[in-house]
Amino acid sequence: MQGCTAQGAGRGKGRAIAKASPKDEDAWTLIARSGEEMDRSSLRPLVGISSCLKENGRGWHHTVGDKYVRAAIHAVGALPILIPAIGAEFGEETATIEALDRLIDSLDGVLLTGSPSNVEPHHYEGEDSRPGTAHDPARDATTLPLIRHSIDRGVPLFAICRGLQEVNVALGGSLHQLVHEVEGRRDHRSPKSPDTDVNYAPAHDVDIIEGGLLHRLLGERRVTVNSLHAQGVDRLAPRARLEATADDGQVEAFSVPDAPAFALALQWHPEHRALENPVSMKLFDAFAAACRSRAAARLGLPLRAAAE
């Protein structure tokens, strides 16, 4: 079955932002307090983006890949807010959770990014990692409670790559640390090329579960995606609904059906050249619509009937 490709092939850097379709505008247009219709860019939802804590020889830095910031601005139409990997900086875990809850309540969406680091295995009762495995305990200590509280408080959540793995662990699932060493699994790692477009090139198909959220959003049963991960889902979390698998059976997407708001996790990277790819834009459009809906409610603005 011929599928769509979930990453663009163009190399142009300057891109215009596509206008919303009439259907999207009918469904998600906000109405200003004055009663005048607002266009899609008139209200930018606040979207928090997860950060990594990295040492670069000159100290420790909270970092976010530029592609995630650009996707939040241009594909979501959001004002991005970087969420530092605060870890245990507030002392006791309860203080960290209280701080995160204050942050969550001010956000209209959360975007969980990818990262070369692995979730520490003690969070899912896994075996010790091999020597040299990259970890980010401060990020784990931030994102795992952030995920649970964002979902339970009705904040739209879109998770990418490591973000998917974090959501699975946060909700009680487990991970393969090295998917390519699991019997029957392909190597899901990317090439080691200095050319980013080579690393993010189409790698394999994913089969989409009929009738699920992803199927409803894309209208496709198969798409082709990039692949840049060694870690992956082993046991799917009890609250998660499988949305897509690779041809080797590896989990590629899941949703959280009991979440009050949009909650979707992808193993691939739709943020890479998102504006050039219709599949990626359908996903970001759905996340954006959910974020605008929360922004309207949070600011006390009326919202037209949501799309079915």
Predicted regions and their residues:
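N-terminal beta1-alpha1 cap of cysteine-dependent amidohydrolase-like domains
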Residues: C4, R15-F158, V169-H176, H180-L217, ...
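Compositionally biased, low-complexity flexible segments
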Residues: Q7-G12
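Glycine-rich beta-to-alpha active-site loop
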Residues: A159, L164
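A short, structured beta-strand/loop element
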Residues: P260-F262
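Active-site-proximal beta-strand elements of phosphoester/diester hydrolases
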Residues: L264-Q267
